[in-house]
Amino acid sequence: MSKRHSSKYKIDRRMGENIWGRPKSPVNRREYGPGQHGQRRRSKISDYGLQLKAKQKLKGYYGDVTEKQFRRSYDDASKLKGDTSQNLIGILERRLDMIVYRAKFAPTIFAARQLVSHGHIRVNGVKCNIASRRVNPGDEISLGSKAQEMALVLEAQSLAERDIPDYVLPDGNTKVTFVRIPTLDEVPYPVKMEPNLVVEFYSR
């Protein structure tokens, strides 16, 4: 198993949830965390613990982004008008690597990030290798010519376990348009996300 896939499943085990809804996730077979102490009964979690877990789960879902990047997303969300938790989700869903994942150009968020960093993704026809770039409504995201025949891209497009959400409009198999910034209810999370607890965590 590659380091990337091992890390992906480690996040699932750490959270105790199949956060991407993958059929091969080890938490489908067991309900305890990673490591030699994973089978111990979990004690009641404090409010701080719940907030921390909510942050780690959301952060992990978006490819285990760095704390610096995640905190910047929160800070930007808190400066916008409206509900900070909704703003945070909107900012995270605008990440280029997430749009590549939502478009089913890649089977995992990690593979999506790799496609971007290797220069296989175009934004409005221009190559972009910055996974954290925030896409705007109306932007077109497309696969480069070499990527269109990649095995991992073809694998992703055949996956039946997830659909392309309404806020990402496909144009054939190689291009999508980011239609609008979604609300929390629109995002197809396989597990419950609690961005309100993330806001509480950073507001302490």
Swiss-Prot record:
GO terms for biological process: ribosomal small subunit biogenesis; translation. Pfam families: Ribosomal_S4, S4. Coiled coil: none annotated. Residues 94-157 form the S4 RNA-binding domain. Signal peptide: none annotated. Gene3D superfamilies: Ribosomal Protein S4 Delta 41, Chain A, domain 1 (1.10.1050.10), RNA-binding S4 domain (3.10.290.10). Transmembrane segments: none annotated. The keyword Ribonucleoprotein applies. It comes from the Bacteria. GO terms for cellular component: small ribosomal subunit. The keyword Transmembrane helix does not apply. InterPro entries: Ribosomal_uS4 (IPR022801), Ribosomal_uS4_bac-type (IPR005709), Ribosomal_uS4_CS (IPR018079), Ribosomal_uS4_N (IPR001912), S4_RNA-bd (IPR002942), S4_RNA-bd_sf (IPR036986). Residues 1-46 are annotated as: Disordered. Keywords: Ribonucleoprotein, Ribosomal protein, RNA-binding, rRNA-binding. Disulfide bonds: none annotated. Belongs to the universal ribosomal protein uS4 family. Part of the 30S ribosomal subunit. Contacts protein S5. The interaction surface between S4 and S5 is involved in control of translational fidelity. One of the primary rRNA binding proteins, it binds directly to 16S rRNA where it nucleates assembly of the body of the 30S subunit. With S5 and S12 plays an important role in translational accuracy. This is Small ribosomal subunit protein uS4. It comes from Zymomonas mobilis subsp. mobilis (strain ATCC 31821 / ZM4 / CP4). The gene is rpsD.
